[in-house]
Amino acid sequence: MKLGKNMKLRLMVLFATGLMAGAMSSQAQSYNLTDLGALPGDNISYPAGLNSQGQAAGTSANATSGIATLYSDGKVISIGTLGATDLSFAQAINGSGQVVGYDYTSSDVSHAFLYSNGRMTDIHPASLFPNGSSAQGINNSDQIVGYGWINGADDHAFLYSGGRTVDLGTLGGNESMALAINDAGQIVGHSTTASGVVHAFLYSNGHMTDLGMPSGAAGSSALAINRTGQIVGLIGINGSSHAALYSGGVWTDLGTVAGATLGAVATGINDAGEIVGQATFPKVLIRPASPGKRALYKPSFRVGFVVQNGALVDLNTLISTNSGYAITGAVGINDLGEILCSATTASSASRAIVLTPK
């Protein structure tokens, strides 16, 4: 399922133009790396979510298909599809190993799904969202959040609980997306306001609260929330995006990784307040243009980060220099401090990996 056109454009602006709650040791934490693998015949895997039992949800892919997967007990298994196509994508996992995401029908409409006890169930609310839906988060009470496409352009956040789906509405604009939910049932995401600006929201006890943004920011988005209600995401600052923490009613600008001037976003926070995310470095001029020759650039690239001692630290500096992997993003951190990441291999294959503290 695709973002609504207007929401996607605004989020592209936030990303491209785009402290710590707990005390941390002054010594940088280093990590061991585990490749979560892919299904037989596939050479690509993408990470989605990680629980504190060491289970991870993701997607295994090749040139023509992608299948949602569950990594558990050292093995990766297919969790299948809803049957119409060979495309399914996991987005989140809870502490019981239940996985949510979306699948596609033969008519190319996305349907939210729940995978539980070895079975994938279609939870698409067709009456609310006839144009498609995607599940993005699940808590340990089996409450599921996501968004549905209500027409040709606009998405609305939803909550699925007890077999019933509720449209959560917006902050006054046309669009909203629910991206995460904690065990207290608090939901976070982002929505357009009546003026068309993207703002982070917190939905709790039937009410959507606008979390606003710090003074000088151009917008905000909330991507994750922990058990104590701390929220992470991004804010638009001075033509870039910065990773951000919202706690106790206050936004904290976490900045970006040194040199990553194209921006950063915080994607995960555990119950200890440890934060991870992704930052983007600009292209670098290698050879200036000269008569008969074009300028050469090192392409823009992304890295995963963890916040240590108040700074965003490139995770590539915290693993073995001969690992054979380049970490391109971190998508979540569990309560053991294990970090789920995306990475590329020496052969440029995308892989889901887990970093375990040494």
Language-model features: where?
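Residue-level hotspots at or immediately adjacent to binding/recognition sites across diverse folds
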Residues: 4, 9-11, 24-358
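Bacterial N-terminal signal peptides
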Residues: 12-22
